[in-house]
Amino acid sequence: MAEKNRLVTVAALQFACTDDVSTNVATAERLVRAAHQKGANIILIQELFEGYYFCQAQKEEFFHRAKPYPGHPTIVRMQNLAKELGVVIPVSFFEEANNAHYNSVAIIDADGTDLGLYRKSHIPDGPGYQEKYYFNPGDTGFKVFQTKYAKIGVAICWDQWFPEAARAMALQGAEVLFYPTAIGSEPQDDGLDSRDHWRRVMQGHAGANVVPLVASNRIGKEIIETEHGNSEITFYGYSFIAGPTGELVAAAGDKEEAVLVAQFDLDKIKSKRHGWGVYRDRRPDLYKVLLTLDGSNPVK
């Protein structure tokens, strides 16, 4: 008798954050439970969901929000929830490691096991998104995690703009890519709206690597007081799930709380990926220029 194909149901959550950790974690748990009720096996919560996106301003006091990875209370709570529901949950958090700080995600398997840590590699620095003040560049490299339901790759927000990150995870066998995110308006330019660009870039990653992709973003207006006045970002949501050709299979708007769900046949996608030939026809020997910042070392 032929084995059944491997089906996986993924979910992206979207909600507005308050500046109260317990309230936000409770909201995340409520939506994880809602996603589970819809049949989800792997559930993505947005980036740094424990509070406001504090990186709008450079304030020493915000370092107090960081906590060590071992025994982190929100991770422990999500471990218990994952075990109870039998779901996989990537958990984004502000990590303190001695005198270093990282924008990190812990991957919790369906039995509550912590499978390991990814630290954000690409750290942005611009008006409203001053992450270099808070976070060291990640040192884990791009990784994949074998969960109960699928081998997954997880990267964080600004990482999603770099095709090299998606390809690195896909080359290691990632069957689904996940990107927790916090992105919205640009404080220095009211006319700049990146939401469509943001979505299309990741749809391209899905299509180029022939893997589904899940992106979860927050919504709502957040105001941070600074010494120069208030900084304000309206987060645009637009969370989505893309299929293996980059097609949009589920999408949220820019204001509403959402639980997006989609099912994929991993074995069918694997056959499509192999048949399409993009991994067969790769030429790593010609890509050494990618190891330089300015393209000055092309293959001769």
From Swiss-Prot:
Keywords: Hydrolase, Polyamine biosynthesis. InterPro entries: Aliph_Amidase/BUP, C-N_Hydrolase, C-N_Hydrolase_sf, N-carbamoylputrescine_amidase. The keyword Hydrolase applies. One of its GO terms (biological process) is putrescine biosynthetic process from arginine. Residues 8-266 form the CN hydrolase domain. One of its GO terms (molecular function) is N-carbamoylputrescine amidase activity. Coiled coil: none annotated. The keyword Hydrolase applies. It is an enzyme of class 3 (hydrolase). CDD domains: CPA (cd07573). Transmembrane segments: none annotated. The active site is at E47, K120, C157. PANTHER family: BETA-UREIDOPROPIONASE, NITRILASE C965.09-RELATED. Involved in polyamine biosynthesis. This is N-carbamoylputrescine amidase.
